[in-house]
Amino acid sequence: VGRVSGSLSLVEFPADDPARARRFWEGVLGVELDARTASEGQGWQTHAAGPAIGVHERGRGPGDSYSLPYFVVGDIGDALMRVRDLGGTVVHPGEQWAICKDSEGSPFGLARAPLAE
């Protein structure tokens, strides 16, 4: 069953020490963070039902200075246009996922529905 548009798909944590961060989140949540597929990007994440928790090495991606919630969208191009039209900014556009800021400057990510499943 696919996730509906607008649902939370991923919370991403940049880490100075990815191995330590993986141990932390695996221990806290009691789940494994697996290596991502090429389409998911660099790092590790949970692949269980519900929103994923992800970790990547700081300095290896556009969302490196803060934790990011990612939300599912059906069409990422349309979603990025809506972000701009509503006063937000697109920090890192993409076809699979994107990083944006809302009208108040808070960062968030968007993930195309198949990527988020």
Regions found by a protein language model. Name each.
Residues 50, 94-95:
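Residue-level signal for tight coil/turn positions that link beta-strands
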Residues 30-37, 86-93:
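Short secondary-structure junctions
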Residues 21, 34, 77, 89-90, ...:
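Ligand-binding pocket scaffold of soluble enzyme catalytic domains
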Residues 1-23, 50, 66-71, 112-117:
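N-terminal beta-strand motif that seeds the catalytic metal site of vicinal oxygen chelate
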